[in-house]
Amino acid sequence: YCHYQGGSDCVALYLRENPQSRFFSGKGLILGGSRAQNPFGKAYCGDLSAILIQNINPLINLIRVPSKKIALMSEWDTKLEAIAESTIDRDITNLSGVPSWFLVLIKHILKKTGRQNLTEVWPNLEVFFHGGISFAPYREQYRELISNPDMHYVETYNASEGFFAVQNDLSVAGMLLLIDLGIF
């Protein structure tokens, strides 16, 4: 529950701060990990992001890419190519995932399209919700790869144990603790 509510809170806080947003005019690209069936039973195990995608509200599937089949692939290179193929011609307005994983995907997409920056591929891209690792070492690379001066980067603090905080004011580096998600 807390991860889905935390994700909803991220979007709500972003939209409150950016009422001119065109967030819902396109699709959200969620890049998650992989999962596999437990060899000892019917339960699935794997990266939290994959388990969340597997069980996501069906309505969210209307506004996100790639398909579950692609998103849950376990072989990274195959998954990378499938995501690129299925999203290059889509209207992507937002990204969600781990900065290091997305960096690999972005570079793959740029190489595949022959474009210099991601704004040429997805001109309506406006926000990247990121977490899992510090964004600081990647910030400059992202600024070079996404030339849109109005691009927003929203930091989140989530882990397997729960969804703890989100950057609610993009002008400061701090995050808002999400104390109503059953964690504290």
Can you say where each PLM-predicted feature lies in the sequence?
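Active-site phosphate/ATP/adenylate-binding loop shared across adenylate-forming ligases
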Residues: 1-183
